[in-house]
Amino acid sequence: MSLTEEIKKRRTFAIISHPDAGKTTITEQLLYFGGEIREAGTVKGKKSGTFAKSDWMDIEKQRGISVTSSVMQFDYAGKRVNILDTPGHEDFSEDTYRTLMAVDAAVMVVDSAKGIEAQTKKLFEVVKHRNIPVFTFINKLDRDGREPLELLEELEEVLGIASYPMNWPIGMGRAFEGLYDLHNKRLELYKGDERFASIEDGDQLFANNPFYEQVKEDIELLQEAGNVFSEQAILDGDLTPVFFGSALTNFGVQTFLDTFLEFAPEPHGHKTTEGNVVDPLAKDFSGFVFKIQANMDPKHRDRIAFVRIVSGEFERGMGVNLTRTGKGAKLSNVTQFMAESRENVTNAVAGDIIGVYDTGTYQVGDTLTVGKNKFEFEPLPTFTPEIFMKVSPKNVMKQKSFHKGIEQLVQEGAIQLYKNYQTGEYMLGAVGQLQFEVFKHRMEGEYNAEVVMTPMGKKTVRWISEDDLDQRMSSSRNILAKDRFDQPVFLFENDFALRWFADKYPDVTLEEKM
């Protein structure tokens, strides 16, 4: 098969949702259809000892939540599918946002009882900003939920995107009978031995069933007043196809997968800092690091840099340029993943995600190129932390482990590090409290370094240029610090302290990140 044909087979997408909407369960079912797991186990198997395939970190297994993005790959129906399962927990939005830079489409999982929740809305805004296609799976039809028309209306109003139902539920909860499949023009049956039936048989199958009569009325209304189906509108991110189903009972999931692969886009190009778009079908290899993860295998204390291949083909042992440093690197020890299990890979193409063993060479956002090509892709988003803690080693004899742990976890982007300009004291910044808990857990479990953490509360963060810097500007209400790149930064006690500073030093430019 030619390189172009290989690249056109790729489908790379992320699954996004609010916590507990069923995101990891649907991931399990997709892997089951891809033949990667023998049984799709329910995710929160804390008592049974069975854990989700994509929740590999110790703390994830204890809590039944995803706190890191997992990368999984399988072949299905002539396509090579790359799934990135992202953390649903709001504190880990940084990791999720960066992951969304590495995909060509997103699958949004919605709980039918709860509709569009806060985290879903937040993540959708990032996806919308990138204009990538969004496919919606409304989950948990095996339980009682809200009316389908109400859910579609909320989706359109809250997210500001047009929707088109690909199927429609016949009842829900205990009265759930199946799906009226508008796209494939058939009925998908929840009960009995037969999985499908023709629409012509519907009146006989569901004689005297008020839910089926309601479905026919709903569909008539949608056909008269609903949106027109358009493949181009889907690819432009203007229309989301909506699928109903139940991930837990594996109902409607395979139909979703088949239809998703029919309409999901091939790998797309990425913009460089100069505004050019790198074509995925170009023969020269290029890619960018969107995530770094330490200790995926605690026995080996390893670090993996996750690279999205943007163009061309990776071959084992190839030399690449690391644009940020201007130095070369050799990609000899490279893996692909099924959550924590992995296999060495000898070649991969645009659209694929590979893991490069890293001894500290790479940073999140790095661009890799070959030959004379030395461009950089657009930077990944960075986020301004909102809450802070001072951190120090509990045991002074463990300084080495403490520094190694902090360095690796900061390079992962799991937490942000600041040093007090005057005292050199370490301060950690996070988007939410759970990030601190995970940091402490990993420092103790993976680096054998107990830490003392002292809350500093919320701070308003602003960056300042070296030229404007005067250490006398610092006070107890605005702490002067350096970020991990040695850029000066002020941590203001509150918005009032920020305004007071701005009034006192009107010529000083204060910069805010996302």
Swiss-Prot record:
Keywords carried by this UniProt record: Cytoplasm, GTP-binding, Nucleotide-binding, Protein biosynthesis
Superkingdom assignment: Bacteria
Binding site for GTP: 17-24, 85-89, 139-142
GO biological process, one term: regulation of translational termination
Location in or out of the cell: Cytoplasm
Keyword Nucleotide-binding: yes
A GO CC annotation given for this chain: cytosol
Short name of any one Pfam family annotated for the protein: RF3_C
Boundaries of every tr-type G domain copy: 8-268
Any one GO molecular-function label of the UniProt entry: GTP binding
InterPro entries tied to this protein: EF-G-like_DII (IPR053905), EFG_III/V (IPR035647), G_TR_CS (IPR031157), P-loop_NTPase (IPR027417), PrfC (IPR004548), RF3_C (IPR032090), RF3_dom_3_sf (IPR038467), RF3_GTP-bd (IPR041732)
The keyword GTP-binding belongs to this UniProt entry's keyword annotation: yes
Job description of the protein: Increases the formation of ribosomal termination complexes and stimulates activities of RF-1 and RF-2. It binds guanine nucleotides and has strong preference for UGA stop codons. It may interact directly with the ribosome. The stimulation of RF-1 and RF-2 is significantly reduced by GTP and GDP, but not by GMP.
Family statement: Belongs to the TRAFAC class translation factor GTPase superfamily. Classic translation factor GTPase family. PrfC subfamily.
Record-linked PANTHER family: PEPTIDE CHAIN RELEASE FACTOR RF3
HAMAP family linked to this entry: Rel_fac_3
UniProt protein name: Peptide chain release factor 3
Organism: Streptococcus pyogenes serotype M28 (strain MGAS6180)
Gene: prfC
